Amino acid sequence: MKYTKTLKRLLGDAIRTDRKMILYILFACLLGAFAPLVLSLMPKLIVGVVENPGTDAIRRILLISLGFFVLEFLVEGVSLYCSNQVLTVANKTRFELMHEQNKKIATADFKYISDRSIFKMYGMAFEATSGDWGGVVGMLREFARTAPIILSLILIGGVITALSPLTGLLLLLYAITYAYAQRQANKEVIDNDAEINKISDEIRYYNKTAGDFKSGKEIRLFNLKDMILNAYKNVIDKRKSFSLRAVNKTFRKSLLSVLILIIAQGIFAYTLILSFKNGSVDTGSFLMYLTLMLQFVLLADRAIEDYEFFVVNQTIYVENMYDLLETDKLSSDHGTRDRLSGAVDIEFRNVTFAYPNTDKKVLDNLSFKIAKNETIALVGNNGEGKSTIINLLVRLFRPDEGEILLNGVNINEFKEEELYKMFACIFQQVNIYPYTLGNNISMQETYDLERAKRAIEDVGLKERIEEEKNAYERNMSHEVAKDALELSGGQEQKLAISRAVYKDSPILILDEPTANLDALAEHEIYSKLNDLREDRTSIYISHRLSSTKFCDRIILLKGGKIFEEGTHDELMKKKGEYYEMFTIQGKYYTKEA
């Protein structure tokens, strides 16, 4: 069976994490298997003393009781220790597998991340390591918990079968039919897993939105509370309907197993009473057999429900996780070359590109060159391909046709990490990471403090940072640090630009990096960046044209092609589309007297 193969592989990973895992499971199996059988002897022994009391009956009963209590204490203590150790190893295994998953995602081609197709393909894989309830931990924990119960059921079933073979056969049939009922109920969940995952994502979204500080203002000012709560209730109702269907299916499918169990218990009771009457079973054995029957039913229900849900049902998530870890389809990085040294020229040669799952060509047979140390501006309306050129240049996406060259070398020939070293990129969306200010400037674990300070000064943040105590060593996330360093949106934008200043790369790319700054502040930033572009090939993108006057050349894109090209002065004299764009925006760059 498929889940047996998956469980075997997961156990192998757990044992590689900690070889003592074998001992923990072995002890749990031995103790769990024999404990119920041994403890069922207690009433038999006590009744035996009562029937033949002698002069020291009370002492013997106390000794028997004490012995069994001590035995139970030891068994429970060792079992609890083994269970805790299994749980510890299971979580260690989960974290190691989670680390492998993250490595896989980090090296996946950007196209899988950008449209979340990787999460559609492998959504269940992330559920396998997302918590310590199900998935990896659930399978290992419940296997260690149900394996000894199954062994115990075999032993108890053997004792019962020795007395009544028909009862033993019916109990086996009961276990099979009840397991089938549970399997069908779980199948209801598995068959609708995609829809359930979608609903779970919606529930998580509403939970996050309700407590999100950034959403709090609009929720209150626009009175969105009722709308959000109604939507949340609808999602919860959908989730409840799936659970209700599973419960109803379990009930219907379980009726046959319940009927078989009643018949088995009736036959066993009849056989036991007859054996008691003819003297082949004494009073103590009578109580022991009753105890064993009760234990069998309770243990069987628990083992089947837990095993079916936590082991079999969770297998699909763990299988998906292993599929993700094994696939080689997510990365097309097969480059072998190291980064280029010195100045770099760029060439787009007959490049055509459409984003995944679309037919619209964003770039259509586009060709242009950027000389070493030249600075160009890419301008045009939204959707004309400016940011797409950057995405292709840094190999986040790959052209459908044509090639992109650095110093005459196709970018596909470079190792991914070596290619990235050649670019200092600042994008419109600023991400602040839960590390220190120094780490967020350098984007490295260790950094040059003086170099970081110069970068901050170059983007005009020196005075703001000097207001803070130990600013460069302060974490920038309130989620991990109480005294986190907090910057405004515009200041975060400047911090992002300081990363490009800090990084020693031959190609500088600024894709709408001043979107959160006003026009005059943007002009000042670009004026400073103009002083820093020496010995760098630079590409500027901005809807606002504050940067274009500093560029050696301007490329205006329209319809996936170059519509206008030239210096600022040349295009202004041409009085074409660039002239109109710049003239309309010009008033925003003029300071008031």
Regions found by a protein language model. Give the residues of each.
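Extended non-transmembrane interhelical loops and adjacent amphipathic helices
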Residues: 1-8, 91-137, 199-242, 314-327, ...
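C-terminal portion of ABC ATPase nucleotide-binding domains
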Residues: 471, 527, 544, 549-593
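ABC ATPase nucleotide-binding domain helical subdomain, centered on the C-loop/LSGGQ "ABC signature"
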Residues: 403-405, 420, 438-482, 526-527, ...
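Cytosolic ends of transmembrane helices, especially the final helix of ABC transmembrane type-1 domains
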Residues: 224, 268, 289-325
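ABC-fold ATPase nucleotide-binding domain signature/coupling loops
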Residues: 122, 462-495, 504, 517, ...
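Transmembrane helix-loop-helix hairpins at lipid-water interfaces of multipass membrane proteins
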Residues: 22-78, 156-189, 267-270, 276-283, ...
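Membrane-integrated ABC transporters
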Residues: 1-35, 55-63, 82, 86, ...
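Helix-to-loop junction immediately C-terminal to a conserved catalytic motif
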Residues: 393-394
